[in-house]
C-alpha cells in the first residue's frame, strides 16, 4: 500500500466498517439502532460522505435514509438528488412524511457538471441532504 494511502487511512476522520470508531464526532441517528451500532453507535456522520454499497439497486435502500430525510424535511431544508439511478417515487415519499416541495432532482451531463453541482449544493445554506 502506498505511503500516502496508509497515511490517509490513519486519519481519524476516515471510518472503516471493520474497525471501531476511534473518536466520537457529530452524527445523526439513522432511525435504526442496529445500523447506528454498525456506524460506531452514533449514526450517519455529519458533514461527511456515506456510501452504501449494494449488490443491486431498488431493494429498499431508501428506507435506510428515510428517517434522515423526514428530519431534514421537518427542518425545512432542501434535499438534493444528484443523478439518481431511478426517479424517486414522490407519492411514497410524501406518504412517508417527506415534503416533496423540498426535493430537487438534478441530472448532470458530465463529471465536471456533477462536481460543480455537488460543491454548490454542499455550500448552500438551504441544503439539508445531498
Stretch-by-stretch model annotation:
Residues 1-81, 91, 95-100:
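Detector for small/aliphatic-rich hydrophobic stretches
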Residues 76-129:
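Conserved inter-motif catalytic segment of the P-loop NTP-binding fold
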Amino acid at each position: 500500500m502506498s505511503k500516502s494511502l496508509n497515511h490517509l487511512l490513519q486519519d481519524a476522520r476516515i471510518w472503516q466498517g471493520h474497525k471501531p470508531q476511534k473518536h466520537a464526532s457529530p452524527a445523526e441517528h439513522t432511525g435504526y439502532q442496529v445500523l447506528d451500532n454498525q456506524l460506531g453507535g452514533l449514526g450517519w456522520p455529519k458533514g461527511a460522505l456515506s456510501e452504501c454499497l449494494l449488490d443491486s439497486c431498488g431493494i429498499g435502500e431508501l428506507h435506510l435514509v428515510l428517517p434522515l430525510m423526514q428530519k431534514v424535511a421537518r427542518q425545512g431544508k432542501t434535499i438534493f438528488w444528484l443523478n439518481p439511478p431511478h426517479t424517486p417515487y414522490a407519492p411514497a415519499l410524501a406518504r412517508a412524511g417527506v415534503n416533496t416541495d423540498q426535493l430537487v432532482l438534478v441530472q448532470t451531463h458530465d463529471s465536471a457538471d456533477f462536481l460543480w453541482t455537488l460543491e454548490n449544493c454542499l455550500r448552500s445554506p438551504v441544503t439539508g441532504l445531498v
